[in-house]
Amino acid sequence: MKHPIYVTADEAVKAVKTGDHIHLSSVASVPHVLIQALCRRADNGEVRDLHFHHFHTEGPAPYSEPRYDGIFFDQGFFLGPNVRANVNAGFADYLPVHLGESQKLYRSGALRCDVAMVQVSLPDENGMFSLGTSVDCSLAAVESAGTVIAVVNENVPYAYGDLVSPGLIDYLVKDNTPLVTKAFAEPDETEKLIGKNCAELVPDGACLQMGIGALPNALAAALTDHKNLGLHTEMFADGILNLIKKGVINGMHKKIDTGKVVASFLLGSEEVYKFIDHNPDVLMKDIKYTNDPWIISQNPEMMAINSATEVDLTGQISADSIGTRIFSGTGGQVDFVRGATMSEGGKSVTAFASRTKKGQTKIVPVLNPGAGVVTPRADAHWIVTEYGAVDLYGKSLQERAKLLISIAHPDDRNDLDRAAFERFGPHYHNFSI
């Protein structure tokens, strides 16, 4: 058992050695004070060849920047706008992994974790710390790392669920920098239609998984007349909070963690962070738990609602890339697709606008060259756009093509139909769905 001591950020990062692999707590809880201290060591020529691993991070990301080429090398599990350009320029990299398995990388030793840098709440009466808004795979990193540096921040909410024992920590650093908050754009008319179409698939008493952003917020707004919904998700934000406050989400029909909101990380307003602070109705859990398909499936009528960058006419779903350009990450999409479809009465839903902001169709004859298939065609079920919803489960390739074309943008349907005919031959036009 370790006996943590309080030190300054500059003193703490002296534990980092050249060649180390470093885990950063992510999303709203990035330990920027430690990153800044590490940059000072790098600027003085004290360390090099450091590898960073993390989920989506908010704020400056010097660990991915060209000026630290050869000194820092970023290998994130999920990309945000702060690292995306550097990854696609080759100054940083992307490590594909289902989020539910990200913790296994550390626990199995498949990925080194020499140093874990995390943010934690003030300790409770038993000396235990909460990882607050970012439990994800940070708990696994803390358990696996040779050295653990924890920033104790009074702005990190104390969330019930999986906690960190002080016996796992080497160094504690006090810093009360506010957590990053994020306001998402209001849904546009297209997103509102998609949200409405998704909401029509959600029965009262269902259990939800959804992400963050304008489209999930549109769905949340369309669910205000539903009753007795549950929440078991990897993350949530303000749209979900509104449903909880209105009593729409109460978890009364959940078969596991009944009455509890279960998540692994958050990003949103300060109100969301305050909501989880010492709230016994919220459990912030290890990603191993939240994203375990078997755990997910224990809740009946589980609704996994995710998005895509494009879908081809056979139902292959790309969500992490646009052609060869990495956009985000695999995320937990497949974890929840599998869990929802294993659930009694569950549904997997992939929702997106029929066209990009530039007017290009997202339902395509074939995926752009180099695009990653996140959800394979055999796992594709409900597909939703502003023009409707179709279920691909149990449908042949030609049947899928007809269904998908029916919810494509009207101006793209003729071209898609022609492409389907060229692919499948004359029989394609000889049957109806």
Locate each region found by the language model.
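Conserved alpha/beta enzyme-core scaffold
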Residues: 1-433
